[in-house]
């Protein structure tokens, strides 16, 4: 209930799922260490005002989408996002994917390689722009992902650990209408809701044209590598990406 403060009373779950809530990161001051502390970081999000009118445009929730959705899950179900995912999704599917990693698994991790430096002078940028506030609220480096606190934390938007097979196993639920083998996790009606367009235009954080449904982006001119159809996709650091084609029952 406290999330409704400071102009957020009309934010719906679909806005969290589609990066349209107006709360695309933490307001300053914030550190990477702050987001490891679930209670502190979700309280910070609850207290701040949105940076644009919710529902009017997308702005990629690069680090905090898992905290926003995860706290909804925790308030309803009582479990943390990582535990809920492990017990309700990864476990039934036999998928080797983890949100918050046990230290015993650290030896299996391939470290993320830092990207090249940006070819721009950061001092010339508008530090009050939504994009800069998002990517600096906070601004973890790739090297931080090599460290124990990051690996063990519950950061649903950014620190899932798995491999190509496990990502495909989880997304196969969407590609196959909510059911894989004997495991049914989603109804056909829920699958259809993924493709309810929530925002289509220049993303306020990425600065690129993006078409968002619920939880995924969908084909648009910003993704010319995709065919048309009921396809959901996204990607991340290190070249990771997933394409979910519901018409061909395929995940790539």
Q: How would you label these PLM feature ranges?
A:
Residues 154-161, 231-243:
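Glycine-rich phosphate/pyrophosphate-binding beta-alpha loops
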Residues 224-232:
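Short, surface-exposed loop/helix-turn segments at secondary-structure junctions
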Residues 242, 249-252:
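Short, well-ordered beta-strand elements
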């Amino acid at each position: 209930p406290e999330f409704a403060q400071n102009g957020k009373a009309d934010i719906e779950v679909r806005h969290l799922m589609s990066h349209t809530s107006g709360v695309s990161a933490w307001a300053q001051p914030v550190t990477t260490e702050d987001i490891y502390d679930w209670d502190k970081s979700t309280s910070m999000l609850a207290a701040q005002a949105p940076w644009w009118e919710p529902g009017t445009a997308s702005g990629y929730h690069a680090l905090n989408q898992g905290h926003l959705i995860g706290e909804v899950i925790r308030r309803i179900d009582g479990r943390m996002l990582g535990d809920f995912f492990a017990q309700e999704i990864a476990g039934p599917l036999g998928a080797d994917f983890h949100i918050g990693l046990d230290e015993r698994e650290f030896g299996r991790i391939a470290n993320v390689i830092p990207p090249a430096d940006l070819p721009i002078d950061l001092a010339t940028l508008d530090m009050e722009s939504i994009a800069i506030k998002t990517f600096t609220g906070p601004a973890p480096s790739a090297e931080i992902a090599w460290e124990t606190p990051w690996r063990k934390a519950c950061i649903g938007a950014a620190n899932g650990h798995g491999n190509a097979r496990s990502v495909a196993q989880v997304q196969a639920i969407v590609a196959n209408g909510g059911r894989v083998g004997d495991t049914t996790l989603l109804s056909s009606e829920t699958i259809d809701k993924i493709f309810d367009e929530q925002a289509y235009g220049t993303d306020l954080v990425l600065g690129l044209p993006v078409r968002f449904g619920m939880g995924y982006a969908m084909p648009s001119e910003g993704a010319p590598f995709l065919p048309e159809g009921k396809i959901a996709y996204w990607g991340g650091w290190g070249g990771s990406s997933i394409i979910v084609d519901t018409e061909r029952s395929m995940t790539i």
